[in-house]
Swiss-Prot record:
Domain (KARI N-terminal Rossmann) ranges: 5-182
Keywords tagged on the record: Amino-acid biosynthesis, Branched-chain amino acid biosynthesis, Magnesium, Metal-binding, NADP, Oxidoreductase
A GO cellular-component term linked to this record: cytosol
Positions that bind substrate: 252
Protein name listed in UniProt: Ketol-acid reductoisomerase (NADP(+))
Residues bound to Mg(2+) 2: 191, 227, 231
GO biological process: isoleucine biosynthetic process; L-valine biosynthetic process
Sequence similarity: Belongs to the ketol-acid reductoisomerase family.
Catalytic residue positions: 108
Organism: Streptococcus sanguinis (strain SK36)
Co-factor binding details: Binds 2 magnesium ions per subunit.
Length: 340
């Protein structure tokens, strides 16, 4: 189904004017939404549990409260805490403080679509989902443009939910570059599939498999790292800028010919069938329930997966090589933890 890109001129109603806005969570998306909205003249407070994020929000000049206090004070509440903690946070601290006519927003449809969170019928539920990480949402805003966003309405109690969603997207800078209307179902299922089958799960598995094929055939791990991981950014940047066409115009004829001949040998019809199975587990709620169950059990699976990933040879080789390549960027773990 074709969709129409919308821009600032299409945001007809200043639905957030005069509203007290509470951003719940001050992590990757939270700090960006809050700062951008404040810079566009909105009345923003922060609701977050005590800790680094609480301290960072105060340092950045926000009136900062507990989640319950912020929810009680606000007309519009945007929940930007991690997906897995949102249900407990909502039930314990937000739901008891909601009033008829309030609006509750999300940047991802996970908890609403899979019904971990159920909002009263007299409260609006909307979405503003910028298609980029929080630091990029903030940086591009400061540069005078923004990151494209999806917006959606799940529940329109007041008749104003769409206006609130669009005005929120305008406030964070996304309407400068383009908005696409979607649904909670579509955003949630497509986002999870993209992460799992292509952007995160599929990509890292492909890189790891390529590295293992080369090293198992006797090639030097350091050279294998450059061939299958380091150069990935160069190719992805070309695709990002101009699609497959620009990438293929920019590489050698040898590489282009190999692309056409060998790509389908790697990504076969069986791989597509595996992707369909991944999508099915997303659609039927299996993935969501497994993820939440693991969180409630203390994250044993996620912890084990992280330990396994940290011990991969490609990670160890890459860590050593990057020490000699300061141009690839500094890994500031402390800042990353504050904003995640």
């Amino acid at each position: 189904m074709a969709v129409t890109m919308e821009y600032e001129k299409d945001v007809k109603v200043a639905a957030l004017d005069g509203k007290k806005i509470a951003v719940i969570g001050y992590g990757s998306q939270g700090h960006a939404h809050a700062q951008n909205l404040r810079d566009t003249g909105h009345d923003v407070i922060i609701g977050v549990r005590p800790g680094k994020s609480f301290d960072k929000a105060k340092e950045d000049g926000f009136d900062t409260y507990t989640v319950a206090e912020a929810a009680k004070l606000a007309d519009v509440i945007m929940i930007l805490a991690p997906d897995e903690i949102q249900q407990d946070l909502y039930e314990a601290e937000i739901a008891p403080n909601l009033e008829a006519g309030n609006a509750v927003g999300f940047a991802h449809g996970f908890n609403i679509h899979f019904e971990f969170i159920k909002v009263p019928a007299d409260v609006d539920v909307f979405m503003c989902a910028p298609k980029g990480p929080g630091h990029l949402v903030r940086r591009t805003f400061e540069e005078g443009f923004g990151v494209p966003a999806l917006y959606a309405v799940y529940q329109d109690a007041t008749g104003n939910a769409k206006d609130i969603a669009m005005d929120w997207c305008k406030g964070v800078g996304s309407a400068r570059v383009g908005l696409l209307e979607t649904t909670y179902k579509e955003e949630t299922e497509e986002d999870l599939f993209g992460e799992q089958a292509v952007l995160c799960g599929g990509l890292t598995a492909l890189i790891e498999a390529g590295f293992e094929v080369l090293t198992e055939a006797g090639y030097a791990p350091e050279l294998a790292y450059f061939e299958v991981l380091h150069e990935m950014k160069l190719i992805v940047d070309l695709i990002y800028e101009g699609g497959f066409k620009k990438m293929r115009q920019s590489i050698s004829n040898t590489a282009e010919y190999g692309d056409y001949v060998s790509g389908p040998r790697v990504i076969t019809e069986q791989v597509k069938e595996n992707m369909k199975a991944v999508l099915a587990d997303i659609q039927n709620g299996k993935f969501a329930n497994d993820f939440v169950d693991d969180y409630k059990a203390g994250r044993p699976k996620l912890t084990a997966y992280r330990e396994q990933a940290a011990n991969l040879e490609i990670e160890k080789v890459g860590a050593e090589l990057r020490k000699a390549m300061p141009f690839v960027g500094k890994n500031d773990d402390d800042a990353f933890k504050i904003y995640n």
